[in-house]
Amino acid sequence: MQSWPTPEVPALAGTPVPLELFDTADQEVRLVETPPAGSDTPVGMYVCGITPYDSTHLGHAATYLAFDLIYRILLDNDHDVHYVQNITDVDDPLFERAARDGVDWRDLGTSQINLFRSDMEALSIIPPKDYIGAIESIDEVIEMVKTLLDEGAAYIVEDAEYPDVYASINATDKFGYESNYDAATMAEFFAERGGDPDRPGKKNPMDALLWRAAREGEPSWESPFGAGRPGWHIECSAIATNRLGHSFDIQGGGSDLIFPHHEFSAAHAEAAHGVERMAKHYVHAGMISQDGVKMSKSLGNLEFVSRLTAAGHEPGAIRLGVFANHYRGNRDWNAESLATAEQRLATWREAARAATNREDAIAVVEQLRAHLSADLDTPGALAAVDNWAAGIDTTAGSKEFTEVGNIVVAAIDALLGVQL
C-alpha cells in the first residue's frame, strides 16, 4: 500500500546524541541498541497503525508524532531506519461503522486511509518504508498461524460451525513480561479491549484469536484450517517479523495497546520463531484528553487534524501543542494548548529574524539534541528554544531569517519537524 511523500529533513552540523528511550517491559530508560552509525544495517521500527474508520484524530496524531521524533533523532545519529506500519483494514470496528453509516466497509476504509495519508503529510511525519494493510498480509498470517499450530502453540476449537483458531496463553513462559500487569488487570483489559473470554471451547479464557472462521456477511479467505480472516494481534506479528526479522529494535504504539495487543503480538512472534523478545525496546505514547475528558470515539469528543488545518491552524503549531507535554504521559488538549503553540511559533520566528550570536545558536542546537535524545524530553527542548528566543532583541529584526537564525531554524525543522 502506498504511504505518503517524505518531507525534506535538513542535515545538521555538530555532534548528535545517542537516543535513550523508556522500555515498557523493563520499566526503565535505557540506550536504544542500534547498528553502528553509518552502517548499511537499518534500525528496525514497527508502529501499529490505524483501523480506518475515524482518521485522524489528535490521539492518533500524538502517537505518530512521538515515533516521528524517534525517526528524526535516529537520522540525526546517521542511522538508516526501516520503519514499518500496518493498517487494520479488515476488523469488526470497521464493519460496524460501515453498517452504521450505510456504506461498504471497503469504501469507508479507502476514504479514511486517504484522509490519514493527507494528515500525516500535512504534519510532516516521515512515512514508513513499508505501509501494509492486513488484507495484503493474509498469506503471511496464514503461514504464521500454521507454524503456531505445528508447534503446538495454537489449537482449533471444537466447534463444527465456527472452528476458530486460538493461541495458547501458555505458549511462552514469559507471557506478561511486556505489560508487567498482574493477572486481574490482564483479564480486565482482555475483556474490555476486543478479547472473548467467554467463548466456549477455549482452553483458557485469555487465549487469543488467531483465525476467525468464516461467518455470514463477513469477508473471508481460504486457508489450510478453513476459510476465515485474521485475528487482530497476529496481523502485526506477521507484518513486523516478515519485514524486520524475528527480533527487531523498536515496537511501538499508544499505551492503550500495551495489553492485550502488544503483549499478544510479541507472544505470537516469540512462540513462532523461538526468540527471547520480539523487540529490544517496547515504546508507548500516552493518551490525549480534551478539556480534561478522555478523547474517545464513544464519547464523540474527538479533535481531528483535518478540522484543525481546515480552520487555518498551522501543522507546526499542532506539533508544538502536542510536544508541550511529555509523550509518555496522558496529555490534555484544549483551545489554550493551540493558542500557546501558535504564540510560541510566532516568537521563534521573530527571534530567527533577529539572531546574530552564533555561539548561542549552536548551544541551543546542542540543547535540542540533548533533550530529545533523553527519552524525547520535548518540554525541555521547547523550553531551550524559548530561552534562546527570549534573549534576542527582536526590535530590529528583518523579514528574512538571519544566517545565525537559520542554524536554529534548521535544527527545529530536522529534530522537531516544525517549519518556521
Curated annotation (Swiss-Prot):
Motif 'ERGGDP' region in this chain: 192-197
Record-annotated disulphide pairs: none
Pfam families: tRNA-synt_1e
InterPro entries: Cys-tRNA/MSH_ligase (IPR024909), Mycothiol_ligase_MshC (IPR017812), Rossmann-like_a/b/a_fold (IPR014729), tRNA-synt_1_cat_dom (IPR032678)
Description of how the protein assembles with itself and partners: Monomer.
Record-linked HAMAP family: MshC
UniProt cross-references to NCBIfam families, sorted A to Z: mycothiol_MshC
Name of the protein in its database record: L-cysteine:1D-myo-inositol 2-amino-2-deoxy-alpha-D-glucopyranoside ligase
